[in-house]
């Protein structure tokens, strides 16, 4: 609940600060008594103002401490965002290198696949050729002679068994390439899934940090609004204190004028200082009490009936 300083002073001192018309039963209150009453009221107002100043100072210090804490949190959050952005950039560089490496591996796998297809085609041809040769060998030994002639015409193979060994080597190479390709594909799929998961986590963290920034900014704006309200109230307190000080000065001036007038009319010789308002009020009160006593005696004298004259007998 916000503290309304104006309503507080209005409720606490409305009856004291407003100038009231005296009631009929206060017709006989002396001006000195009224001045003393006003002075007591001014002391109460000054005490209340002093209390409010202390409360305001304490709340101002609390708000300043809260503002410092919010600014420190904001600096820490900015530093975290800077480090996190650096982390993202580093991981983005790693991701690009991984993608480049995966692309190179895919190209190599594609090249190896083409080589495998080529070797497979060659292998198929060799198998067909072997089968034909076996059939022909079974049917006629002419094929053996044919192979011998082929071996004689080429420098690549020296014996028929070398051709068979070459075929087995090509088959083993093909199987090895197929296994490597399958492994590379599985690795690429795993890296892709890991990258997608990392991107989702990164987006969630960025969203959470943005929400925290928005919340801290809202708290900072509210703290600034509260500080502005208290600054306005402090200005109002200072204005009220200035008005009360001016009013007190007027009361002291009126007291001094009344004291000087009474001293002059009654020809009193006193050594009371012009700054000693309390002593002046006491002197004024004594004079008014004396005048009231004289007035009362005069009233009594007027009310005593006069004794009629006794006639003398001649």
UniProtKB/Swiss-Prot annotation:
Family under the similarity heading: Belongs to the CFAP73 family.
Any one annotated GO CC term: cytoskeleton
Coiled-coil stretches noted in the UniProt entry, renumbered to this chain: 34-139, 175-233
Species the sequence originates in: Xenopus laevis (African clawed frog)
Protein name: Coiled-coil domain-containing protein 42 like-2
Keyword field: Coiled coil
Keyword Transport (UniProt): no
A Pfam family the protein falls into: DUF4200
InterPro entries tied to this protein: CFAP_domain-containing, DUF4200
């Amino acid at each position: 609940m916000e503290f309304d300083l104006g309503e507080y002073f209005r409720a606490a001192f409305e009856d004291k600060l407003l100038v009231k018309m005296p009631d009929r039963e206060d017709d006989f209150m002396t001006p000195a008594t009224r001045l003393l009453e006003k002075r007591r009221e001014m002391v109460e107002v000054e005490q209340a103002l002093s209390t409010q100043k202390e409360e305001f100072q304490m709340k101002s210090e609390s708000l300043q401490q809260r503002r410092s804490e919010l600014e420190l949190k904001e600096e820490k959050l900015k530093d975290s965002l800077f480090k996190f952005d650096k982390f993202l950039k580093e991981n983005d560089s790693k991701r690009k290198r991984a993608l480049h490496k995966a692309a190179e591996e895919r190209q190599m796998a594609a090249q190896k696949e083409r080589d495998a297809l080529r070797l497979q085609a060659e292998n198929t041809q060799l198998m067909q050729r072997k089968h034909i040769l076996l059939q022909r060998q079974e049917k006629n030994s002419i094929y053996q002679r044919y192979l011998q002639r082929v071996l004689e015409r080429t420098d690549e193979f020296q014996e028929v068994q070398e051709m068979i060994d070459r075929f087995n080597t090509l088959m083993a190479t093909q199987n090895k390439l197929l296994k490597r390709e399958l492994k590379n594909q599985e690795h690429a799929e795993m890296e892709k899934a890991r990258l997608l998961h990392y991107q989702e986590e990164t987006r969630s963290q960025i969203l959470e940090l943005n929400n925290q920034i928005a919340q801290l900014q809202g708290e900072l704006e509210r703290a600034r609004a509260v500080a502005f309200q208290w600054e306005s109230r402090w200005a109002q307190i200072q204005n009220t204190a200035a008005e009360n000080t001016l009013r007190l000065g007027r009361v002291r001036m009126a007291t001094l004028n009344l004291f000087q007038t009474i001293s002059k009319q009654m020809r009193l010789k006193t050594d009371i200082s012009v700054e000693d308002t309390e002593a002046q009020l006491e002197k004024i009160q004594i004079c008014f009490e004396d005048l009231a006593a004289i007035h009362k005696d005069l009233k009594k004298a007027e009310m005593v009936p006069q004794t009629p004259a006794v006639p003398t007998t001649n």
